[in-house]
Amino acid sequence: MIVPCIDLMDGKVVQLVQGRKKALEGDTPLEMLRKFGEFPEIQVIDLDAAMGHGENSALVEMLTVKARCRVGGGVRTADRARRLVDLGAHRVIVGTAAFTPALEEISKAVGAERVLVALDSKDGKIVVKGWREATDLTAVDVLHKLEPYCSGFLCTYVDKEGMLQGTDLEWFRQLREATNHEITAAGGITTMEDIRALTAMGIHSALGMAIYTGRLDLAELARLNVYYPPSVS
């Protein structure tokens, strides 16, 4: 499955490099939704909420009402997760809170089937708090322990995020061998060859910069989702 990304900051659709530097702005959120309507699921990340600088709840609500979305950004409590589901999110993405007791509370509040755990890796270690703080853990270390609380994992290879330089297929292969849960890959996915290799492993692809810069063709990507219903009905 191909999952296009809509990242929100200050009410706009943006793409960041390494989660820090803004590289470009996209069309309006509604226009991006129209462009992505043929895809089975859209990934919406509220960057302001993730960084603790406010939130874009009105935009998130508008997007989730109109399309099947997985939503992340600042999901640190059960109340926040419930609120996103109430707004219309199909699934919520939990990052930093996955390494606290809050994960179990979130899972109980909305159901494990509605939770995706974000595992972001830089220099081989999981990073949290907007990729600003490194841990001593690797993604493979924690996959099994987190499985009871989620339906899948969003795994980002931060080293190449937003850089259009390709991703680390071997890292994703190791993750695939470590869990039977759904995995969505992100970070540096740039070519159809990357996507085909991930698909062959049984891994979904979340795409941002490669779509927004035109490196990958939306129509060609949509055809890869022939077995999935569109997110916008």
List PLM regions with ranges.
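Short catalytic helix/loop segments, enriched in acidic residues and glycine
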Residues: G19-F36
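Non-catalytic positions within long, well-ordered alpha-helices that form the structural scaffold/packing
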Residues: K35-G37, V85-D86, L146-E147, T199
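C-terminal helical cap(s) of enzyme catalytic domains, especially alpha/beta-barrels
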Residues: P101-V110, V115-V117, I195, T199-S233
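Charged helix-capping and loop-helix junction motifs
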Residues: E25, G54-E61, R132-D141, Q165-Q174
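Conserved anion-binding
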Residues: L8-K22, A89-E161
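Catalytic cores of alpha/beta
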Residues: A58-V60, V65-V92, E170-S205
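Glycine-rich, proline-tolerant flexible connector loops at the mouths of alpha/beta enzymes
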Residues: E41-E55, T96, C155-L164
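Structural preference for beta-strand elements that scaffold enzyme active sites
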Residues: M1-C5, E41-V44, R68-R70, H90-I93, ...
